[in-house]
Amino acid sequence: MKAQSKRTSRLLILLGIAVAIIVAVFVWRHFSATPDGSTGAQQHAVGNNPARAGGRRNMPMPPVQAATATEQAVPRYLTGLGTVIAANTVTVTSQVDGQLMAIHFTEGQQVNAGDLLVEIDPRPYQVQLTQAQGQLAKDQATLDNARRDLARYQKLAKTGLISQQDLDTQASLVRQSEGSVKADQGAIDSAKLQLTYSRITAPISGKVGLKQVDVGNYITSGTTTPIVVITQTHPVDVVFTLPESDIPAIMQAQKNAAKNNTTVPVEAWDRTNKQMLAQGYLLSIDNQIDTTTGTIKLKARFANEDDVLFPNQFVNARIKVDLLQNAVVVPTAAVQMGNEGSFVWTLNDENKVSKHLVTTGIQDSKQVVISAGLDAGQRVVTDGIDRLTEGLQVEVVTPRSADTTPTDAAEKPATAEKATHRRGEKSATGASAGSTTTAAEKS
């Protein structure tokens, strides 16, 4: 009896489990098998939010920014690292020995050629000049006396009162005295020159550096220690290097400039390549290539009237070698790199995007020349590229201006949200009966 009772209990339990499973399957099928193929849970959620239902059927188009490819005349530049050097540099030293008596310049001062820089004690050279002048006077008197004696000897020789030998001897004395006078004149000129050297003047116009010798020191000629260094920075030069592969373009640019009676323009930019410092022209090209680096040296000249370039300053030199006419140009942000190479996303009249492979040319931080794959007038996407797929329709928006107020910026998203909500309500009105039922059940 107990065994039969246990079997009956088990059957009832199994029957209850079976009924529960059947009910669960029925309920699941009831909520999931809706007319539009969506699950019951989804329909329930949509019924609670009609705007959301409409949003799923009318997803907003992804916003992008676009630009139009244009035709421009684009200059071609070659860039190399350069060093500013003075057009002329003079190391001022003394040509005479003596004590430094006075300095007539201020360190860093701009001087002109001929300006007095320093004075060396002139007294020893004044004494030498006086001595030379005295010796000249003495020898000149001897010469005058010898010439008078020679004139007498010549008269006596005609009468036969003196021999020819005496006449020749007197003539030799005259020539010796003439030689002494010339030597004395040379000594005077030398003393005057030494006296002139005691006043050292600027050989060129330029800026003086820091003085290397102080007043009171004894200076010797031929010493390696300079008194001061003068650099000419008006104008100033920039020496820079370019790869040897650029030589043909440089030579062609020089030929074109010569035909037009102009020069090849060169720009000097700062170390970061963000600010142009000065504009000049190509002065010369070295006559040989550096085999170690495979580069060639070039020299450009700049007026440097505002002293923006300083000797030994590092700059980036940009030389303009060509001007590309009718080049197709797009913003740099429009060009992307993929496995197949460079490409851009173009827009048709319906604002649908299409991927185009392109060949790029000259480019900088703002724009890129498209050599092939794109025509002027085509629109390209410049922002929002990461959301694009082939054939996707997008909404072209304009970038917000910098002067937009925070209130304006806040109102725009709110307006867009209201528009989306209206589209959702409109879509919810035409929703399926299952969705409407779900919304009614919640209410």
UniProtKB/Swiss-Prot annotation:
Residues 36-46 have a biased composition (Polar residues). The keyword rRNA processing does not apply. Keywords: Cell inner membrane, Cell membrane, Membrane, Repeat, Signal, Transport. One of its GO terms (molecular function) is efflux transmembrane transporter activity. One of its GO terms (cellular component) is efflux pump complex. Pfam families: HlyD_D23. Residues 1-24 form the signal peptide. It comes from the Bacteria. Residues 427-443 have a biased composition (Low complexity). Residues 409-419 have a biased composition (Basic and acidic residues). It is a peripheral membrane protein. InterPro entries: CusB_D23, Multidrug-R_MdtA, RND_pump_MFP. Residues 36-57, 398-443 are annotated as: Disordered. It is found in: Cell inner membrane. Part of a tripartite efflux system composed of MdtA, MdtB and MdtC. Belongs to the membrane fusion protein (MFP) (TC 8.A.1) family. This is Multidrug resistance protein MdtA. It comes from Yersinia enterocolitica serotype O:8 / biotype 1B (strain NCTC 13174 / 8081). The lineage of its organism: Bacteria, Pseudomonadati, Pseudomonadota, Gammaproteobacteria, Enterobacterales. The gene is mdtA.
